[in-house]
């Protein structure tokens, strides 16, 4: 606390409040009389968040598909064009990853908004701090994974606009879990960043 307050030229109170919030979200570990540490990425929590996200996203996107209206297409096509444009640029891997994640979040938020379920997305965002860390870690240097996500987004929208419920269910499951399932190599290269499954 003291070092952080000094670095930002603020009193300890706002730093303490920020640390408490980060601790509640599982991002910091406070050990009294020892120090404050960035927590490990909790794979158990991420697995639970993915389960929650898949369950909710399947329901929200089914609702969106049932009420699909051609007028909704403009916003989604614009976001998909932005994603494609990012992938076509020769950006450094970290910059591309960060920009794509922002656009990815906007894509999913827009789907929830079009389905009239923005509050559901706000809830998911509120419980997804560990997942966001993990996702950022996975995507910062992996252009191929970003391309896979973009292609998934195209498939998701194609299924919605053609009212292909079965295809939508399949692509959403893969979209949510494939990155996590493919992360074993990264986890094995950086085991000190992760809490093991239990």
Features from the language model and the residues they span:
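Acidic active-site catalytic centers that drive phospho-/nucleotidyl reactions
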Residues: 1, 17, 57, 104, ...
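Short linear motifs at protein or domain termini
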Residues: 1-66, 119, 180, 184-198
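Short, flexible segments with low predicted structural confidence
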Residues: 17-21, 31-32, 47, 82-83, ...
